[in-house]
Amino acid sequence: RIYNPVAMAAKAKYNVLGERIVPRFLVDYFIVRNVLKATFDIQFDINNTKNKSFLPQIATGRPNTETVVNRAYDGDIDAFNVSTQSTLLYTPNFKSEKHSLVAFVKVLTNDYKAVFQEIMTSNTASSLLIDPSIPSRTQNSELRAVSGTTQTRSIGGILSAQYSFKDKYLFNAMVRGDGNS
């Protein structure tokens, strides 16, 4: 499609407003100094986006009856994500320096939820009427009004141990399990 660039610059609209904040908190705590350490990590991700656009008939040069003229769009999505990671680290001090052990258990969680709504219409009565909620057409699959939510959750667990004898022989074992919905 070929559009009139002067009319696009003067009459078309395309606005995107996004706001995002990602705070993260981390706590390290020695339950038993240099032997047993707990770490707790949590991160929030809040992302909000608002889109508005309008394609006027004078920019397209197409007849007023086609669905590509006076096309208005308004969309909003709000996404929320919470991730956590909890670790318990065990590093005992042996009397003999020939032995060393590092073991940990870790639990990871994630929760994501998004709420969205959007509407796209065409053939508003005038190029001055740029809001899709006013009377206009929604006759094909592109032109629609939809809303909904999505949510996913996951959890993972790790159990790991590494034993060393004389810094020469290493034995490592790890088990991991995951689940989601």
Residue positions per predicted region:
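Outer-membrane beta-barrel transmembrane strands
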Residues: 5-53, 73-94, 102, 114-116, ...
